[in-house]
Amino acid sequence: KFYETIKLIRKNYPDCDVIINCTSSGDNRVSDDSPYGNAVRMLHHANVPGIEMGTFDAGTFNWGIPGGIFSNSPTFLTTLGNLYQERNIKPEFEVFDMGMIRAVGVYWKKGIVKAPLHFQLCLGVVGGLAATPADVQDMLAYIQRLQAEGNLPKEVTVSGFGIGKGHLPVMFSALANGCHIRK
């Protein structure tokens, strides 16, 4: 479906400058230990031309629903980061808590991902931070602290979204702090 969708966008709207961003998730049943492994989550990134950006969820987290553990092992993230570099795909670092921000810094210091970095603050998921302006502020302050310590590069952009009733508070807080937003 990714290939057909991208092909239709490029064919029917040749002047459209929309960024093609494809997920690396989509199936919480897949992990390093599953029969297909995590490779199935990267097939489109490896094979479909025209993908410019791809999600990189910087750790495992709990969706708060039955069967809702979303596995992003260091093995998977290292392979994904290397694939993105090979294919010139810009990672969108989806971060659901502070630990994921720090993890991105570790992958950056190891050379698995390169600056500039783009963070997507994903707030309101049960297993992550709440979707409040205070949590946006805390995450932005943590990014700045890691930058000051040399554990994140200076070249960083940030966007944010909140789930459900947190959508507008996160959106307005992100905008007020000079960030981008995702609808």
Predicted segments with their positions:
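Active-site beta->alpha loop and helix N-cap motifs at the rims of alpha/beta catalytic domains
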Residues: 2-71
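Conserved mixed alpha/beta catalytic, RNA-binding, or beta-rich assembly cores of soluble enzyme
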Residues: 69-73, 80, 95-98, 102, ...
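C-terminal alpha-helical cap/extension of soluble enzyme domains
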Residues: 147-183
